[in-house]
Swiss-Prot record:
This is GTPase Der. The keyword Nucleotide-binding applies. Gene3D superfamilies: 3.30.300.20, P-loop containing nucleotide triphosphate hydrolases (3.40.50.300). Transmembrane segments: none annotated. It comes from Francisella tularensis subsp. tularensis (strain SCHU S4 / Schu 4). GTPase that plays an essential role in the late steps of ribosome biogenesis.
Amino acid sequence: MSFLVAIVGRANVGKSTLFNVLTNSYDALVFDFEGVTRDRQYGQAKYDDLDYLVVDTGGISDKDVGFDEFMAKQSQIAIDEANLVFFVVDGRSGLTTGDEYVASLLRQKDKKVVVVVNKVDGTDEEAAMAEFYSFGFDKVFAISAAHRRNTQKLVDKFLKKTLNEYYQDYTQTQEHKEQQRHGIHFSLIGRPNVGKSTLTNRMLGEDRVVVFDMPGTTIDSVSIPFERHGQKYTIVDTAGVRKRGKVKQTLEKFSVIKTLQAIQDSNVVVAVVDARQGISDQDLSLIHFAIKNGRALVLAVNKWDGMTEEDRIQVKQDLKRKLFFLQDYVDIHFISALHGTNVGHVFESIDTAYACASKKITTADATRLMQLAVEAHSPPMVGKFRIKLKYAHVGGHNPPVIVIHGNQVSRLPNSYKRYLENFFREALDFRGTPIVFEFKQSENPFADRKNKRSKDEGSKSKKVK
């Protein structure tokens, strides 16, 4: 489960600006769902090699109707889920009753809180921060998010240590969870009312999840262990992710976080699409998130029953056009969760994807495949020199990570990287899982000797003079 940073505070203090700084600065995948242009509320960001999620809770002002109730729902859910809270206040306008209310909520929680005093450009930082110490939090820091003043220092000072500690503990916990995990852990993701809960019940063979014919019946993720044909599984039915313009209920907003975390905790992700509505930007966002996080993937196109042949052809053409990047390795099944049509094939693809993602490859095999790929198609020239790939080894599983060492590898074009991925995928018969390639510059064993020789020669020439 990813580390979560919650940005809380009243309206117009600069939360969204800080959100953009945290995400866009670190090669972020931001969930800019259709239907909203003003606020991007959910984002994945990176610090060094560590991923984390950021949520902007939206602004609240004293003039809002139902202030207490809305704030309690909106901010408390974010605070409860968060590993670190950035409590943003306005250094220009000073302390307000809205700030005091947020502070009172935070004091009730056992959370790590940093009071971020924003908009301090052109002011005395110490003076701007002074009154906010009255909240009782020992961490108060001044920034200007709009001008990125002190924002990197904010991350280095408060996020770095907490993030590293979290992932050290998390790694140990995950190792224990993997030992205790009930078989293959897979999640069902998709928009509301695409049939995830119906598919869950069909896979379980009983009505374990309440289903109504209305969007958003499942508010939170439901995790259920079961066994089928001797294979153990744990299925997670996530709440649906709808268009941002339609995300109105506060609980539903934070179900997005649950969905993203369920993806990260899964061995395999089953993306469920409504055949009659087609694939949407929300579906694509979730699929991209799963791939970016290295999850094995299966696509289930539901509600296939009752469609005309003409409509089916149109759906397949639309899928081929929008999912061109998945055509070569992800299984797509056209199913009816209600009647059970082709659901068995979904299980087969889950098993295959998991087996491929967990497949053990030796260093000898990885190097041999790399050599065969190079023999079939050599890397391009870089100036007067050809890029040379020397050897390969496996850097991890689920997803498979292939580490290739060589010279000039930083100049290897993306087209050749795609060629290597396709070559390895075909040779290893990998289905359903991404393959991650890492390229490392080989160390020159004579570099230190050359440097020493140069220094010695320099010393000798000085003596001759």
